[in-house]
């Protein structure tokens, strides 16, 4: 597995993946200790395109990513993550709307859990999912980051 740490407006981001594609995008802000597995190899060149696209996203010049992704999860989780990728830039959906879109209308809590376990934040846009009351709800990396990403997209649509 290869990795790189890139800087962003919301702090350092860890990218990890292999020839199959990007497997992880994790926010490192606020983490006191970063444990990178001993068998991972730092490789900036491998993540050059991902870093370029993320920089364009944060600059408001990119609305959708074109990267090879290889998230690991259950079939259900992968169906949720695929549905998240269909939420247009600058828009939001509720957990229930995602559940309906994947043909499991009563599984909105399971959708929330799959959303929380998304290993490739931003690129699989779990930040675009909100509560049925329109409020920001749980985000594994913190509501401040979720709010930042939603405002970034909203401001770039104007």
UniProtKB/Swiss-Prot annotation:
Its EC number is 2.1.1.63. Its main location: cytoplasm. It is an enzyme of class 2 (transferase). It is found in: Cytoplasm. GO terms for molecular function: methylated-DNA-[protein]-cysteine S-methyltransferase activity. Coiled coil: none annotated. Keywords: Cytoplasm, DNA damage, DNA repair, Methyltransferase, Transferase. One of its GO terms (biological process) is DNA alkylation repair. It catalyses: a 6-O-methyl-2'-deoxyguanosine in DNA + L-cysteinyl-[protein] = S-methyl-L-cysteinyl-[protein] + a 2'-deoxyguanosine in DNA; a 4-O-methyl-thymidine in DNA + L-cysteinyl-[protein] = a thymidine in DNA + S-methyl-L-cysteinyl-[protein]. The active site is at residue 126. GO terms for cellular component: cytoplasm. Gene3D superfamilies: Methylated DNA-protein cysteine methyltransferase domain (3.30.160.70), Winged helix-like DNA-binding domain superfamily/Winged helix DNA-binding domain (1.10.10.10). Involved in the cellular defense against the biological effects of O6-methylguanine (O6-MeG) and O4-methylthymine (O4-MeT) in DNA. Repairs the methylated nucleobase in DNA by stoichiometrically transferring the methyl group to a cysteine residue in the enzyme. This is a suicide reaction: the enzyme is irreversibly inactivated. This enzyme catalyzes only one turnover and therefore is not strictly catalytic. According to one definition, an enzyme is a biocatalyst that acts repeatedly and over many reaction cycles. Belongs to the MGMT family. This is Methylated-DNA--protein-cysteine methyltransferase.
């Amino acid at each position: 597995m290869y990795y790189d740490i890139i800087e962003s407006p919301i702090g350092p981001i860890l990218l990890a993946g292999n020839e199959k594609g990007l497997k992880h995008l994790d926010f490192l802000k606020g983490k006191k200790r970063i444990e990178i597995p001993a068998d991972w190899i730092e490789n900036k060149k491998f993540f050059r395109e991902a870093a370029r696209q993320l920089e364009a996203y944060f600059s408001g010049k990119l609305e959708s990513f074109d990267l090879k992704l290889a998230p690991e999860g259950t079939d259900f989780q992968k169906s949720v993550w695929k549905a998240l990728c269909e939420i247009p830039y600058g828009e939001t959906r509720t957990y229930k709307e995602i559940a309906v879109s994947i043909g499991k209308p009563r599984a909105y809590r399971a959708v929330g859990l799959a959303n929380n376990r998304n290993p490739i934040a931003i690129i699989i846009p779990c930040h675009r999912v909100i509560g049925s009351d329109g409020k920001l709800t749980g985000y594994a990396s913190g509501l401040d980051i979720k709010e930042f990403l939603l405002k970034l997209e909203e401001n770039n649509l104007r």
